[in-house]
């Protein structure tokens, strides 16, 4: 479920005015490690805030990213409480386990195009590899590799705001997955963040993203990590809307209990 949750954050949008509120509606699917079927969802961007909703059965899972306040909120529609993460502190701790000097990232045009949601999308081949230490030990390392095709619609409504948000977040060391999962797989979390940064720099919206995640490593955990690989996540944009969004959409509902996490 965490992997499906991560996938729903795969974004979408380019701007007409200098600053616009963007709503991105998408469908997410995947296979591997318990992932099956599709989930509908929406991503909302307002300045340096983003909200991601993923509908799974009769429950909606929500993550709110408030970059300026350095807070991440995670909650669902059933449980009237939200987990709150201080991302300045969490990001600093996570960075200690990830070897950024050995990171490899590339998003290159492949010369292909296709129609998605009535837009012409240009094809790119993406590959990001990130190494991290397991349990703080340099003798046991884990490498997360993300690869696959991305189909980007340049100059689509909402793109500038999409890019602005992700650039601001990555500059502050943010990740875009559940921090609990990121603790176990920091390299994967950082690789995903680097992927968003690379996409944002192209200047368009990824209307379709097919990401294959492979894990590798050294030491006694190498075999287990290899079996954790071959997870594929697909996100497709169904629609992009440029409409004003209320400020309270980017905070837990009134009355929710807030649980501070570390």
Predicted regions, residues:
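Bacterial N-terminal signal peptides that target proteins for export
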Residues: 1-8
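Sec/Tat signal peptide C-region and signal peptidase I cleavage site
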Residues: 14-20
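Extended soluble regions of mature proteins
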Residues: 20-262
